[in-house]
Amino acid sequence: MESLPTTVSGKSDRRGRFSKSQNTSKPSLILAFFSCLAWLYVAGRLWQDAQYRAALNTVLKMNYDQRPKVLTVEDKLVVLGCKDLERRIVETEMELAQAKSQGYLKKQKSVSSSGKKMLAVIGVYTGFGSHLKRNKFRGSWMPRDDALKKLEERGVVIRFVIGRSANRGDSLDRKIDEENRATKDFLILENHEEAQEELPKKVKFFYSAAVQNWDAEFYVKVDDNVDLDLEGMIALLESRRSQDGAYIGCMKSGDVITEEGSQWYEPEWWKFGDDKSYFRHATGSLVILSKNLAQYVNINSGLLKTYAFDDTTIGSWMIGVQATYIDDNRLCCSSTRQEKVCSMA
């Protein structure tokens, strides 16, 4: 019986140790549980990051495939169309060389009834409001009707040169058409708008139209305020027949006017250098170009630069070609000398 307390006491010790171990294992279980949660969270994030990386790689690969390639100079030229343009330029140069060898002629031009090449085409500038001036010329130095035809048989063509109205087909155009049907002495520039500010461009259209319609030795531009000594002009041109590259007129140069609003103001004055002086050129009242120079204007009309005035415009074209400048005092229409072939009307 004495041993019983010992047994009871041992059982109590075991229960105490069990409850203590039970109390100790609860935090461990909780820690283990949270460790599992943390592991699952980390594993989930790692998996999610892996998915993001895979998606990012896919996007990068797509962008890489779609990004512009590094182009060589040749590739860039092809993309810009320069290669095709270069080919067309070469073809055009070959066509131009062939045209030069044939005298620039695009088609057979009119010749006199005798079969000889025309001596000259004389274009007299006119405007819509110049009907009285035209009649004055027809009654003085300019032949009309049968006399005009006989002059053409001698190799000289004279035409009034005019463009079209800004309002195509209006009363201004109709009056010119009616007058031309009666007199047959107009060269109508269909692609040119007749206006004061368009005069420098008119020169291109005149020489182009004249070259395309008549095969002549010379092409003469005359203002409508000039009276011609026609026989004197013919004699002057005959003396220069077959002279290539002839740029003939009353040569001059002068100051470039820079003051806006002045009568002779040149908007592009800064292109004429610090001295602001025009190059030598023929006065606009009367300008003569030989056949090859007029044909040069015809071929390059789309590229030729125009300035504020037609005389300096023509002079600028002549600087870039092999032109022979012929300063003939007989063509100084405003001078007082006796031996001249023109005078101010």
UniProtKB/Swiss-Prot annotation:
UniProt GO BP: arabinogalactan protein metabolic process; protein O-linked glycosylation via hydroxyproline
InterPro entries, sorted: DUF4094, Glyco_trans_31
Role: Possesses hydroxyproline O-galactosyltransferase activity. Transfers galactose from UDP-galactose to hydroxyproline residues in the arabinogalactan proteins (AGPs). Is specific for AGPs containing non-contiguous peptidyl hydroxyproline residues. The addition of galactose onto the peptidyl hydroxyproline residues in AGP core proteins represents the first committed step in arabinogalactan polysaccharide addition. AGP glycans play essential roles in both vegetative and reproductive plant growth.
Signal peptide (from-to): none
Tissue specificity annotation: Expressed in roots, rosette leaves, cauline leaves, stems, flowers and siliques.
Name of the protein: Hydroxyproline O-galactosyltransferase HPGT2
One Pfam family of this chain: Galactosyl_T
Pathway this chain belongs to: Protein modification; protein glycosylation
Disulphide bridges: none
Single GO cellular component term: Golgi membrane
Topology Cytoplasmic: residue spans: 1-27
Keywords: Acetylation, Glycosyltransferase, Golgi apparatus, Manganese, Membrane, Signal-anchor, Transferase, Transmembrane, Transmembrane helix
GO molecular function annotations of the record: hydroxyproline O-galactosyltransferase activity
Cellular compartments annotated: Golgi apparatus membrane
Membrane-traversing stretches: 28-44
Enzyme class: transferase
Gene name for this UniProt entry: HPGT2
Keyword Transmembrane helix: yes
Family: Belongs to the glycosyltransferase 31 family.
Residues that bear N-acetylmethionine: M1
EC numbers: 2.4.1.-
Cofactors that this protein relies on: Mn(2+)
Organism superkingdom: Eukaryota
Chain ranges on the Lumenal side, renumbered to this chain: 45-345
Gene deletion effect: Reduced levels of arabinogalactan proteins.
Bilayer disposition of the protein: Single-pass type II membrane protein
